[in-house]
Every structure is written in structure tokens, then in C-alpha cells.
Amino acid sequence: MLHYAMIFFVIAIIAAVLGFSGIAGAATNIAWILFVVFLILAVISMFRRGKV
């Protein structure tokens, strides 16, 4: 999931440089949502992990 967030972030940067504001905004929003979901799942998995 973090991989997809990074892909959408790169697409947003490229679109912003080329001047496609609508595409850049959409890609940025998708990347942000995926990154937040990744962080939430990472924190949950840290607390649910059993003791070693």
C-alpha cells in the first residue's frame, strides 16, 4: 500500500510540473489517503503483535 501511495505521489509531482492541476490534485488526494491508511494499519499491527 505504501508502494501505491509513492506511485501516486510521483504522478502528482509530474502532473504538477507539467501544469495539469486537476490530475495533480486528484493524485495527491489518492496518495494522501493511501498513506494515512498505511500508517493506521502499521500502528494497529504493531500493537497486535504478540510478545517475542
Swiss-Prot record:
Keywords: Cell membrane, Membrane, Transmembrane, Transmembrane helix
Pfam family membership, one: DUF1328
Residues annotated as transmembrane: 5-25, 27-47
Taxonomic superkingdom: Bacteria
Location of the protein in the cell: Cell membrane
GO CC annotation, single: plasma membrane
Keyword presence, Transmembrane helix: yes
Species in which this protein is naturally found: Xanthomonas oryzae pv. oryzae (strain KACC10331 / KXO85)
Protein name from the UniProt record: UPF0391 membrane protein XOO4217
Family: Belongs to the UPF0391 family.
Topological type in the membrane: Multi-pass membrane protein
InterPro entries listed in its UniProt record: DUF1328
Keyword Transcription: no
